[in-house]
């Protein structure tokens, strides 16, 4: 099933209604919960979190660092979902995200892999249906495509 940019945006935004950012306990827990899920289900990727390579979900839950990091990742997801219909702004945000992450020397394949992780998190909390998952993966495909173009144009490793 092919979806329009507007349909993708609407479905992604809807999937985030229960995953709002914010300073309330629930808002903080939403973001921290992503990293609890991440550290439990993708332990091999902990290497990208200097000083937290051996963290468990319980360590993450008690970590102010991941309270803040969780807010950043959720905010980023809200932003890309909400600007998806504005293709130039979406692409600019993708490029800016790459620029901020250059120092971590991430495997370029991880940009698409993120959306598998993120949709897995949403599914694990009951916040995602099949249509919304398809929308996130479609958004992720476009996100990744712009990532790879920008990585290539920046003379950085990219997925061919």
Curated annotation (Swiss-Prot):
InterPro entries: Globin (IPR000971), Globin-like_sf (IPR009050), Globin/Proto (IPR012292), Globin_nematode (IPR012085), Mb-like_M (IPR044399). It comes from the Eukaryota. It is found in: Cytoplasm. Keywords: Cytoplasm, Heme, Iron, Metal-binding, Oxygen transport, Transport. PROSITE patterns: GLOBIN (PS01033). Residues 2-152 form the Globin domain. Heme binds at residue 101. One of its GO terms (molecular function) is oxygen binding. GO terms for cellular component: cytoplasm. The keyword 4Fe-4S does not apply. Disulfide bonds: none annotated. CDD domains: Mb-like. Belongs to the globin family. This is Globin-like protein. It comes from Caenorhabditis briggsae.
């Amino acid at each position: 099933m092919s979806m329009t940019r507007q349909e993708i945006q609407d479905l992604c935004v809807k999937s985030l209604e229960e995953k709002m950012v914010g300073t309330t306990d629930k808002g903080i827990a939403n973001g921290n919960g992503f990293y609890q899920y991440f550290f439990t289900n993708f332990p091999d990727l902990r290497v990208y979190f200097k000083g937290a390579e051996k963290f468990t979900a319980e360590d993450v839950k008690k970590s102010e660092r991941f309270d803040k990091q969780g807010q950043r990742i959720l905010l980023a997801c809200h932003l890309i979902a909400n600007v998806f219909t504005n293709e130039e702004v979406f692409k600019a945000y993708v490029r800016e995200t790459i620029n901020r992450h250059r120092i971590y020397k991430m495997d370029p394949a991880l940009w698409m892999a993120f959306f598998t992780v993120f949709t897995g998190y949403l599914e694990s909390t009951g916040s995602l249906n099949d249509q919304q998952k398809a929308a996130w993966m479609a958004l992720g495909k476009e996100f990744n495509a712009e990532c790879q173009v920008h990585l290539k144009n920046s003379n950085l490793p990219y997925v061919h």
